[in-house]
Amino acid sequence: MSLHLKPGQLTLADLRQAYLAPVRLSLDPSADAPIAASVACVENIIAEGRTAYGINTGFGLLASTRISPADLEKLQRSIVLSHAAGVGEALDDAMVRLVMLLKVNSLARGFSGIRRKVIDALIALINAEVYPHIPLKGSVGASGDLAPLAHMSLVLIGESRARHRGEWLPAAEALAVAGLEPLTLAAKEGLALLNGTQVSTAYALRGLFEAEDLFAAATVCGGLSVEAMLGSRAPFDARIHAARGQRGQIDVAAAYRDLLTASSEVARSHEKCDKVQDPYSLRCQPQVMGACLTQMRQAAEVLEIEANAVSDNPLVFAAEGDVISGGNFHAEPVAMAADNLALALAEIGSLSERRISLMMDMHMSQLPPFLVANGGVNSGFMIAQVTAAALASDNKALAHPASVDSLPTSANQEDHVSMAPNAGKRLWAMAENVRGILAVEWLGACQGLDFREGLKSSPKLEQARRLLRDKVPYYQEDRFFAPDIEAASQLLASGCLNALLPARLLPSL
């Protein structure tokens, strides 16, 4: 993928593509003047002997310590070395690439006082697929993502290591792959690299992208379950949802109508049945999934803004010659967006688990107990439903909001923090849980449909059915179940059901 970056204009679709695959990045020339002006402003402050935080002072609680001109370069190198204190497993290439893209986008806005040379070095690393070692843990999301961004920056100054096409290389070798040599950071540049919400935002963006894929899958699986359970189409009638007026609900109901078309032989087979109302997990899908969609859209809006934001501190306003300390590094918007995504993921999984449970109950589903013939000898989906219940319950605990947590840091100078990285990275575990739940529902709904006398569903639902059946056959009798769940989960992880939903329903698709 080639991406020509106009600073501050990244879209969610751009970010999704950059997360999914390597990118060839170029920077629009319009960035040159603002970048140069901000650097000149920093240089003028030093030349005039003015005091400005982060340029010629210490950091955090040490901000009142004035640094001599002779030590300014050492100051910037020292902040990178000392702040690289993260722990845990290394982020994968996709996450590091996303972090670096976000950092380039922020720095290139021209409010950070960092030279084009440094920004170009980050771009060169991205283009050469050289990804610095960044540990998963160590940021509280204020004052920015200091530790992980310090690890990202170590490679630029010839320290630490980076991964290139699966191989770890010492920093000097990694730089050489990208045609670079170690940099000497000028005044303000170390702080500009470290300060910002790019890691928190990348964590939450991954959560958003996975949540979107799972939302699409849950909508399709929910439609399949309606068919398998001989559910009514009446609850999806557009008039019901227009009367309420909730945009997300209206859009989701339309998506279900698109899946549950009148061409379905399954639907026609029970048009004259005497069932009045279906259980809520079937009937209220537009209401619940619509609320989830609204949460996801709101979170996506916040994250797209943050992806294009300047979250450095202090900020350089070159036109006025001012350097002003503020708090854009505080990732509270990201933390709250991630918390809202967590609520949506928990509900998507919870609703799916309830549909699975309905299909297991022969009194509710009018299907063989646990979706298998010769019950007793065969246990069918009995324990698969238990697995889904365990995963749904796990997500209830993980959905607890991270943004309400705060621990003071930096000797109480940084006395309120966002915990945005925690809010973001727990989304990955939640998404994995939801993927497992939906895998069981997909398997179960297709098994249920196979019992419906060979009747076909609508074209799109038949397409979803074929996708699964190409990998997992019908259950004639009990067999080793876990590999089937894994096969369905891998299909879901590919986003293979996204195309079955209307275009532009989800923010980044």
Swiss-Prot record:
Any Gene Ontology biological process: L-histidine catabolic process
Main location per the UniProt record: cytoplasm
Any Gene Ontology CC annotation: cytoplasm
Compartments (UniProt record): Cytoplasm
Modification sites for 2,3-didehydroalanine (Ser): 143
Iron-sulfur as UniProt keyword: no
Alphabetically ordered keywords of this record: Cytoplasm, Histidine metabolism, Lyase
5-imidazolinone (Ala-Gly) cross-link site: 142-144
Pathways per UniProt: Amino-acid degradation; L-histidine degradation into L-glutamate; N-formimidoyl-L-glutamate from L-histidine: step 1/3
Broad enzyme group: lyase
PROSITE patterns for this protein: PAL_HISTIDASE (PS00488)
The reaction(s) this protein catalyses: L-histidine = trans-urocanate + NH4(+)
Keyword check for DNA-binding: no
PTM annotation: Contains an active site 4-methylidene-imidazol-5-one (MIO), which is formed autocatalytically by cyclization and dehydration of residues Ala-Ser-Gly.
Molecular-function annotations in GO: histidine ammonia-lyase activity
Pfam families, per database record: Lyase_aromatic
InterPro entries according to UniProt: Aromatic_Lyase (IPR001106), Fumarase/histidase_N (IPR024083), HutH (IPR005921), L-Aspartase-like (IPR008948), Phe/His_NH3-lyase_AS (IPR022313)
Similarity remark: Belongs to the PAL/histidase family.
Protein name (Swiss-Prot/TrEMBL): Histidine ammonia-lyase
Gene: hutH
